[in-house]
């Protein structure tokens, strides 16, 4: 009883003094918190820079569609969109057979998380430059070729590969070959052998032959009945919508068409990266003629203002998106009987809703023809087949379908490729053709960017880049005039015009600062001089003793016609930025002299510099000149190095593998 009374007393005491107790508690708690000892420093595990091979192997789950069927992924790596076009052909044939498929840009694919779980993958990949992956395949390629990937990373993933290359390049289809090899090394299962196409000869035919043999094997592997894919009728993936000023479908004003938003890549410091998919619009600062009035050709020096948004290094390439000739565009508009000012968009056939994202556009038909469609290059066989469906004239249809067959390769090459017949030419030659504009916009290849060797150093003029462009125009065997799309357009640019462009990194570089005492030998006739102009500007900026150990071989027709940048070169020579300047004139006398001849004339000097570890550079025509230069170099190595053919070639191969023999060539 006393205990209970004591408890009651304490309870009353606490209640009567609760406010004071709380205040005291807060004061004490605050004091203890403010005066608590500091916590011990956190303990961090030592970072492991090596790849965790076990962590790379996420749980394997086979990719399936909504119906539970395995999905084929068709990956493309492209610089000119040809590989993407080929992937769409595979997609069309998949649908005919009944195979669920998805075409995927390698740049947007989450390869680390998804590749291990794919049920079947097909790679259609191009090789760009000197054995390099295309811009959109670079990240995937670097990931796949990392030597520390576990050998069972892609265990059992079925795959096949088709490569797009050019046999005139040294590293023919290198990217496709590496991807094919690495997929197998990492545990993938090769279902069908790798195919390779040669863009210098029969790329489209090579692709058609490969897929014809590929389908029976792949269908058997996936468990599908092989159905004929020989029916080459055009199957549209998009429908065209004509829009009003508010981008609403004029046939259904309740539907709004919007462009697909671009998500530009950002650098580590959150700056926008300008590339092929997101070009920078640069202002033209200068556009001047480099040839004399005596020349029957034209070569332009063009400078662009980059500002702080875009950077480059000496030897890089500049990609430029050209615009088709306006007269040709108007001719096409008239021939197809359309209104060039109509605002249109292409949207997926199966896409519905009040707001639809366009796959192409919105834009006017005139702009589509001007900036996006390749209307001048030789027509592909797939386009011939699509055009053939648009005529009621049986003779025209028969002729076009025949030209698209493998049996007609020789005639196709003679009539289409060698004569440079574009789609506008065919529409004029076959008056019965009347393709639907929606189909025409879809099956006509896109106008690719043109790549130019940069002819300046960023240290010469801050925020300025230059290119050197010879204007392409010639007459074919059938006396048909052909003008290069990009070079002609570039030649007409005025100061202040804006040009969509981007920088592409190149391996064509001067020796690094650590090895800059090594001599350099440069061989570049015609516009092959372009990167070497940048090299000389860079050497002048460095201002080191390497200047005395540089040798340039330049070639042109004569000193009064097309000796481009002559004053600059002579000034570099006089100021010792350039050690030796050797010029070959092919039309000055009855005896034609080329850069390879001059190499042999100066063979002692060339060998002396090679013995000092010289870097050897070749830029220009890859079909004839670069091969002739290499033959001259082989001759010098055999003579002064006392080597036979094989060991002389091995000498050059060793230079190449160590980055001392570099080529920047085109065809």
Curated annotation (Swiss-Prot):
Residues 30-667 are cytoplasmic. It is a single-pass membrane protein. Its cofactor is FAD; FMN. One of its GO terms (molecular function) is NADP binding. It catalyses: 2 oxidized [cytochrome P450] + NADPH = 2 reduced [cytochrome P450] + NADP(+) + H(+). Its EC number is 1.6.2.4. It is found in: Endoplasmic reticulum membrane. It holds the Pfam family Flavodoxin_1. Binds 1 FAD per monomer. Binds 1 FMN per monomer. NADP(+) binds at residues 297, 527, 586-587, 592-596. InterPro entries: CysJ-like_FAD-binding, FAD-bd_FR_type, Flavdoxin-like, Flavodoxin/NO_synth, Flavoprot_Pyr_Nucl_cyt_Rdtase, Flavoprotein-like_sf, FNR_nucleotide-bd, NADPH_Cyt_P450_Rdtase_alpha. FAD binds at residues 468-470, 484-487, 666. The chain crosses the membrane at residues 9-29. GO terms for cellular component: cytosol; endoplasmic reticulum membrane. This is NADPH--cytochrome P450 reductase. It comes from Dictyostelium discoideum (Social amoeba).
């Amino acid at each position: 009883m006393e205990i209970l009374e004591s408890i009651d007393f304490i309870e009353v005491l606490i209640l009567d003094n609760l406010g004071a107790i709380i205040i005291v508690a807060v004061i004490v708690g605050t004091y203890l918190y403010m005066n608590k000892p500091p916590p011990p420093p956190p303990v961090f595990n030592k970072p492991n820079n090596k790849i965790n091979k076990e962590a790379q192997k996420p749980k394997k789950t086979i990719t399936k569609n909504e119906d539970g069927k395995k999905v084929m992924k068709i990956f493309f790596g492209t610089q000119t969109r040809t590989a993407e076009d080929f992937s769409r052909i595979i997609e069309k044939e998949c649908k005919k057979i009944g195979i669920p498929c998805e075409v995927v840009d390698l740049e947007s694919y989450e390869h680390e998380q998804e590749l291990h779980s794919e049920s079947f993958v097909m790679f259609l990949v191009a090789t760009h430059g000197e054995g390099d992956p295309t811009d959109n395949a670079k990240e995937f390629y670097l990931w796949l070729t990392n030597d520390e990937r576990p050998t069972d990373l892609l265990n059992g993933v079925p795959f096949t590969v088709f490569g797009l290359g050019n046999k005139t390049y040294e590293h023919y289809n290198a990217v496709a070959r590496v991807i094919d090899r690495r997929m197998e090394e990492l545990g993938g299962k090769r279902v069908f052998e790798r195919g390779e196409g040669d863009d210098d000869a029969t790329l489209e035919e090579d692709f058609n032959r490969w897929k014809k043999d590929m389908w029976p094997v792949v269908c058997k592997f996936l468990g599908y009945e092989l159905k004929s894919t020989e029916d080459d009728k055009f199957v549209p993936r998009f429908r065209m919508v004509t829009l009003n000023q508010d981008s609403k479908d004029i046939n259904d004003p309740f539907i709004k068409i919007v462009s697909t938003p671009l998500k530009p890549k950002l650098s580590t410091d959150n700056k926008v990266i300008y590339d092929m998919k997101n070009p920078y619009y640069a202002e033209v600062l200068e556009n001047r003629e480099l040839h004399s009035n005596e020349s029957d050709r034209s070569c332009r020096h063009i400078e662009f203002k980059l500002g702080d948004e875009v950077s480059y290094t000496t030897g890089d390439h500049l990609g430029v998106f050209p615009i088709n000739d306006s007269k040709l565009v108007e001719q096409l508009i008239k021939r197809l009987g359309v209104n060039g000012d109509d605002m249109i968009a292409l949207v997926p056939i199966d896409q519905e809703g009040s707001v639809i994202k366009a796959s192409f556009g919105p834009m006017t038909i005139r702009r589509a023809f001007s900036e996006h469609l390749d209307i001048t290059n030789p027509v592909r066989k797939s386009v011939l087949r699509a055009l053939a469906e648009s005529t009621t004239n049986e003779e025209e249809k028969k002729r076009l379908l025949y030209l698209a067959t493998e049996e007609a390769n020789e005639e196709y090459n003679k009539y289409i490729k060698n004569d440079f017949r574009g789609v506008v030419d065919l529409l004029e030659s076959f008056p019965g053709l009347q393709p639907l504009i929606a189909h025409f916009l879809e099956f006509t290849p896109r106008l690719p960017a043109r790549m130019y060797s940069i002819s300046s150093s960023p240290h010469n003029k801050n925020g300025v880049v230059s290119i050197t462009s010879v204007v392409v125009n010639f007459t074919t065997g059938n006396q048909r005039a052909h003008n290069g799309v990009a070079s002609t357009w570039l030649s007409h640019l005025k100061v202040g015009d804006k040009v969509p462009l981007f920088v592409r990194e190149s391996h064509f570089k001067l020796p690094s600062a650590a090895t800059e005492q090594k001599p350099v030998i440069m061989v570049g006739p015609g516009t092959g001089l372009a990167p070497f102009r940048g090299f000389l500007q860079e050497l002048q900026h460095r201002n080191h003793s390497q200047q005395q150990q540089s040798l340039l071989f330049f070639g042109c027709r004569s000193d009064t016609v097309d000796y481009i940048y002559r004053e600059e070169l002579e000034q570099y020579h006089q100021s010792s930025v350039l050690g030796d300047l050797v010029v070959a004139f092919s039309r000055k006398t009855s005896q034609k002299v080329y850069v390879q001849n001059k190499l042999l004339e100066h063979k002692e000097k060339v060998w002396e510099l090679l013995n000092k570890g010289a870097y050897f550079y070749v830029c220009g025509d890859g079909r004839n000149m670069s091969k002739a230069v290499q033959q001259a170099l082989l001759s010098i190595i055999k003579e002064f190095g006392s080597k036979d053919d094989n060991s002389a070639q091995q000498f050059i191969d060793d230079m190449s593998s160590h980055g001392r023999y570099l080529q920047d060539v085109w065809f």
